[in-house]
Amino acid sequence: MIESALIIVPHPDDEINLAGGLFDVLHESGVRTTVVMCTNGDFISENAAKRFYEAKKTQRIFKYEELIFLGYGDDYVGTHIYDANSNEIAESHAGHRETYCAGNEKEYCFGKTRKHHPYTRENYKSDIRDVILEKEADLIICIDLDSHKDHRCISLLFDECMGEILKTSSNNYRPVILKGFAYNGVWLGPYDFFETQIKPTRILLKSGENLSEKCFPYDWNHRIQMKNGEKTQTLKLWKNPVCKALYAQKTQYCSPITGGCILDHFPRIANPDSCYWYRNAYNQALFAQVEASSGDAHYLNDFMLAVPEDSVSDDLCNHSRGWTPDVEDGQPTISILFAREITLSKIVIFQNCNSTLGTLTIRLDNGFETEFQCPDNNVVTIQLPSVPTERLTMQITSYSNLTINEIECFEPDNGFPWDEVPFTKYEHRIVTRNKLFAFLAEYGFKALVRMVRQYSKMKSPHY
């Protein structure tokens, strides 16, 4: 059963987007919850201390036990810290070159070693890895590949860390790992909270966009939907924890960068469900020896579903670095030797959005062989009749622009462990609110937004 949870986000207030609907559930279930904020949210340097105390106030609203700041910068001058060489010192937008805490506490590394860490990629990754291993939480919820560079940085570094942790032969740590977006379907979701019919999380698509690219590296149909706490759906906004948490972010009332108000996003964020993708730590390919007839096979079992070719700001869905067979390779073949005999029941293949995996032949060492025609999808799932094997061979007979980012192999009964988590599976049903009450709540909400915007303009030196 889940007794502890670790929630990893880039900036103060991202915990609201990523898990704001679930803190009540965690608290009421007695789950000890730690939130890790990787940056100080100091893009505007004079707001750093204020954002620290806003985060502490949000902690009290959400009633979770521990808040940790890693103390890194909110964006960087020149090369982003993710793209820098391992030990190259980066400078943050606020002019810092080492970790610090903007409030009355110490950042994570200083609390452990009495030393600040220079802003290097290696230190950033090391601090994330250290906090994961120190807490050994039963449940981890981490930010995913949003369009923001800091969000991508944390997601990618986390995946690097988890791949290394899980692949360590002496390690038996197998948490429930969930990845989720702060933007898609949440911060940038539809403005629908005050509608009379409650609607689940939806992703808005602009002209020319498709769901595969917006959800990269996942399939939208594979999402795990958690039912959010009941209080997050109340129209009595003074009792709604998501609205209260957003209201606590006074530095974000009227952004001098975008002109937006954080409260504007409440009707988008306060969904009845929280959507995540399950990164199953029992993927047997992680512990296997993987070889390929050509190309770099290490990408196939490193836990990474995306690796930028050049920069963290790359178009990852079409230009992520993965396994690509050589042009001269007439019959690209992948061979997976498992660490032990397993009963193989499912294979999941993750590709770039512009990669097309056509036909492949699957062979197991017991003589089982089948040909599979892959659907036109960047995530391909292959169900097998639970066959014992020590080796899997996949010969690809047709493809186009092929780049495979990861292969997962599972034994039977390795779906999402609903019986272990404190959450309830979200089941969509028609719930109709009182139309007049919804209208009055929205009217009051809009008046509140106008008021806080005016307050911010009066207080901020940027106007």
Over which residues does each language-model region extend?
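Active-site rim/loop-helix segments in enzyme catalytic domains that contact anionic ligands
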Residues: 1-134, 156-172, 179-183, 231, ...
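Short catalytic/ligand-binding loop motif for oxyanion handling, primarily in non-cytosolic enzymes
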Residues: 43-45, 75-84, 148-152, 186-190, ...
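Membrane-proximal basic amphipathic "stem/tether" segments
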Residues: 424-463
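Trp- and acidic/polar-enriched beta-sheet ligand-binding modules for extracellular glycan
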Residues: 327-331, 351-423
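Proline-aspartate-enriched helix->loop->beta-strand connector
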Residues: 132, 136-146
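Disordered, acidic Ser/Thr/Pro-rich linker "stalks" and the adjacent N-terminal cap
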Residues: 278-344, 350-359, 412-438
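A conserved mid-domain beta-alpha-beta active-site/ligand-binding segment of alpha/beta enzyme cores
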Residues: 189-254
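C-terminal regulatory/interaction regions
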Residues: 235-283, 344, 411, 415-417, ...
